[in-house]
């Protein structure tokens, strides 16, 4: 027996069904508990406009809370002959409560149902991404403060350039994450808007109370225009993917630096041996596989916006099955990004730095700019000072003065980490996480 919500008086060819269902059941497992939350808000609204009796609502809510708990406990599954999570939840309600379970779809389409599922899922995952970005940020700031006076070479073109410090290096990636948080804020604002009530993209003749479901689910506002609510499918995922890719870009660059600085030719940083891997043939090897995999996974994540754009590239207004494929690249991406963020925070915490790098005379030429500046400050024209020091270097006569004195904002001697922390705290304060958590707890009666 088939359990399709749209079934009429004919059967679909089995090969067509296999191809069109694809990985929907697998992907919908990501959305299961959010489908339940959306249904709880929807039926509460239906009761308020007279489409459900109060006792029906209470029974349906109780059963939906039970299904939600099954999802939380890992005991929920989508049966083989059931198309998707929406069908499975409705089927479970109908089996338990009879015709009452068939009433929950009034004023709703699977189109706006999956839209709200995706918004609720993405909202939850963004909360975790933000928390993990903040945790990594805190580790980087701590390391920056700890090693603020330890000098290291700065590079341009991979050539020794000017003095830098571990305070600057760790702090640079911390500020990068503070900037990335602005993209996550934009992603959150777009995500935290309610599409429920747009039905198949053209609204409903039922007198739906969309503001009520918006409040029940803790959304900041709604996607007002019902056509745009459907057009937002794919656009939301793409813009969230851009935010994720921005964070991934910061991770990838940091991982490259760490791999390079860890190698024997640099020896700027050291990883505990328990955080490295070995070789099957070379007994001396201690490889920074963690950073290499963070780099690769982060580079992969940076392709996500382009994948989504190409899937939805030439779609006109309205729903198309193409949009289902976005789930396959979008939904699993959060696990990958969060895993990279957690591992980066862990490994940064364990990282040790070499505080005697500049004892090696090969780094002396990078103090040439400091000498040029001293001569210029003493009155020599800058170009003359530049030429004088350059000739000394070429003649092997340059003697490095390593007593550097930088005082301006953001320099070796004035990292401004407190300002960077203030930027991050300001960003964190603008997320409405507590509102969301409280709304969901109230809906679940916990």
Walk through the language-model features, giving the residues of each:
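A helix-coil-helix interface module used to build multimeric assemblies
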Residues: 1-203, 208-214, 221, 277-278, ...
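A general structural motif at alpha-helix termini
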Residues: 60-61, 217, 273-275, 362, ...
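Flexible domain-boundary/linker segments
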Residues: 60, 77, 150, 157, ...
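Glycine-rich cofactor/substrate-binding loops
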Residues: 1-38, 99-100, 267, 282-446
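Charged, flexible cofactor/metal-binding loops and thiol motifs
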Residues: 119-126, 130-131, 145, 153, ...
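Short, well-ordered beta-strand elements within core beta-sheets of diverse protein domains
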Residues: 44-52, 168, 238-246, 371-378
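Generic, well-ordered alpha-helical scaffold segments in large soluble proteins
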Residues: 42, 63, 67-70, 92, ...
